[in-house]
Structure formats: C-alpha cells, structure tokens
C-alpha cells in the first residue's frame, strides 16, 4: 500500500487562526513557546489517513514507528534562546526607568533637602508626637512625598508645597496667635505712620499759620489784629496767581 502523505507544515500554517488551532497557544510567535512543545507529542499507532489528517491539527510530531521517519518539528526553539529571551524580559521589567524611579543624583539631592527643610519645622515635630505612624490615614494626614519616584519638576514642587501647608495645621496654637498678633501690630503701626505723613503733607500752610499766630500772641497783639492778619493771609493765598504793581510791595 502506498504510504499516506501528509501536507507540509508551511501548507497548513497560513494564518493566526491556524497557529492557534495547531499549537493551542496565542500566535505571538512559534519560537517563543515552551521548549519541546511541538516535538515530544506522539501520534496514535492505528489510525487511517483521514484520522491522521484530523489528528495533525492537534499534534505535528509523529514517532518513527508510525511514519517511518524521524520526529517532525515545526518552529522548535532551543532552550538557550528561551533563556536569553527570559533574561532580557527580566532586565526590562526590573530596570529603574521601566518602573518609574528617579536616577539623577542632583535631583535626588535637591528633593532630600526640601524634605529635610519641612521635617525641621515645629509643625512636623508636633505631628510626629500627636499622630503615631499606625494611626495615620491616607488623604487625612500629611504624607511625605516619595523622592525616589519619577516626577516632573512642577509636580514635585506642588507636592512639597501642599505637604508643608498641611504641616502648618499642626503648629502650636501659641505660635499661631503670636504670629497673627505680631503681623497685626506691624500693619497697624504702618497705617498710623502713613496717616500722620498724609495729614502733614495736606496741611503744611495751616501748620505754618498756627506757628505765626502763636508768635503774634506772644508779642502782645490784640485779637482784632490777629484776625486782620489771618484775613490778609487768606486774601494773599487767593491772589497769588495775579501780578501787582511794584510799588505795592507784594
């Protein structure tokens, strides 16, 4: 009897669906399957030609007893290739850049200085004393930013700003009241000095007139003479824009 002929592997594997039907694994690549997946399966001994063709979709390799040939293997990869591929995957998965860690030394040093500055405040010390680590809740209590994660400069600075602002809520009450009173007194003094300066700038003529009248009283002038002098000064103030003959003496 003539020997049953089977189709060549490249005649059967013509698409992704055929790959999945043949190997039972996603058709990522024939060379990435487990070693020996296609070469260690054996075909049954007593099968007709049609049954052999149906079984070919489930098992590509057949033993020498059935077909009189050596084991047929399609796309068999070596263990060395798989090992090298596994190592490259492991390096990519564990690299600092892949998981988003900051590796720049200058950036890490700058971030640590910002964290140390925040931890040296009175509010942070009170926070450590009043809230133990086991009682802290995310979203409620301040949390120190993670300097090792990769952030943009703007994102990191915003995290530090919000963290320090939350720490100020734990400042002692006496310190808060002292700062508020001190700032209020400074503002009040500044306002009073500004009002005094504005009043002195608005009434320079009145101050000069009061000085002149007090000197006239000391010289013994009567009230009528003082009033006349005052009227004359007012008249002169209203007529400063006009010119007079030289013989008036003004």
Swiss-Prot record:
A GO cellular component entry from the record:
cytoplasm
Q: Which UniProt keywords apply?
A: Cytoplasm, RNA-binding, Translation regulation
What residue intervals hold the motif Nuclear localization signal NLS1?
Answer: 14-17
User: What InterPro entries does the record point to?
Assistant: SLBP1/SLBP2, SLBP_RNA_bind, SLBP_RNA_bind_sf
Gene Ontology biological process: mRNA 3'-end processing by stem-loop binding and cleavage; mRNA transport; regulation of translation
Motif Nuclear localization signal NLS2 boundaries? 77-80
Summarize tissue expression: Oocyte.
Please name the Gene3D superfamilies in this protein's record: Histone RNA hairpin-binding protein RNA-binding domain
Which molecular-function annotation in GO is an example for this chain?
mRNA binding
Region span, RNA-binding: 102-171
Source superkingdom:
Eukaryota
Compartmental location:
Cytoplasm
Annotated family: Belongs to the SLBP family.
The protein's job, in short, is: Binds the stem-loop structure of replication-dependent histone mRNAs. Is associated with translationally inactive histone mRNA stored in oocytes. Could be a specific translational repressor. Not involved in histone pre-mRNA processing.
Protein name (record)? Oocyte-specific histone RNA stem-loop-binding protein 2
Q: Say which species the protein is native to.
A: Xenopus laevis (African clawed frog)
